[in-house]
């Protein structure tokens, strides 16, 4: 198994940040090469948000009491205090990127970028650009260069912009009406 991850101030403890509208706590990637199963179960969730990008293979995610098999080209969003239960299997050759984030205005920021309340799966398609953003955030958290916290936040905003339905499907929206009125009303 290949693992690359980094944590703000090298702490694996989840936290809630109220000083910033958005703040990155940790970021990483897993690529299953030799192990048969990688389970995660947090019955009470965490106090931050988690976004997982299935870049290859598939993941078995549980939400609303049911198993959902999520293939590559999708992202899964878990909110604070929400049970997190998911599994990756080696036979699926899964590669996943993940990020934990918090902040005083996360819910409104997600809404601004088109995330719906209660939505778990974001159909993103596969893109090396997503993987690159996650890898950049991992690098920033590892190197801790000046302004790295802001750089992580900037890159997470960039990811959200790329996931905005108005960015992913602009032609579908222009057929129904003006892009501004649909996307930012």
Describe each region flagged by the PLM:
Residues 109-174, 181-185:
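Amphipathic alpha-helical segments enriched in hydrophobic/aromatic residues interleaved with Lys/Arg
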Residues 21-24, 46-48, 93-95, 149, ...:
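A structure-centric signal for secondary-structure junctions around beta-strands
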Residues 1-68, 117-118:
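Generic protein-terminus/edge-of-domain signal
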Residues 35-38, 72-73, 81-83, 91:
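Tight coil/turn sites that cap or link beta-strands
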Residues 67, 81-105:
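Ligand-binding loop in jelly-roll beta-barrel domains
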């Amino acid at each position: 198994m290949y693992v690359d991850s980094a944590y703000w101030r090298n702490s694996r403890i989840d936290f809630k940040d109220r000083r910033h509208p958005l703040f990155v706590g940790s970021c990483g990637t897993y690529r299953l090469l030799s192990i048969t199963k990688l389970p995660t179960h947090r019955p009470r969730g965490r106090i931050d948000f988690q976004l997982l990008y299935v870049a290859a293979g598939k993941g078995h995610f549980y939400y609303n009491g049911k198993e959902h098999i999520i293939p590559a080209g999708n992202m899964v969003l878990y909110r604070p205090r929400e049970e997190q239960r998911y599994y990756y299997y080696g036979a699926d050759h899964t590669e996943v990127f993940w990020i934990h984030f918090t902040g005083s205005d996360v819910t409104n920021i997600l809404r601004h970028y088109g995330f719906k309340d209660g939505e778990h799966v974001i159909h993103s398609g596969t893109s090396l650009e997503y993987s690159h953003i996650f890898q950049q955030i991992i690098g920033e958290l590892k190197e801790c260069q000046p302004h790295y916290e802001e750089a992580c936040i900037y890159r997470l905003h960039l990811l959200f912009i790329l996931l905005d339905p108005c960015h992913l499907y602009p032609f579908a929206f222009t057929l129904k009406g003006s892009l501004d009125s649909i996307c930012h009303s």
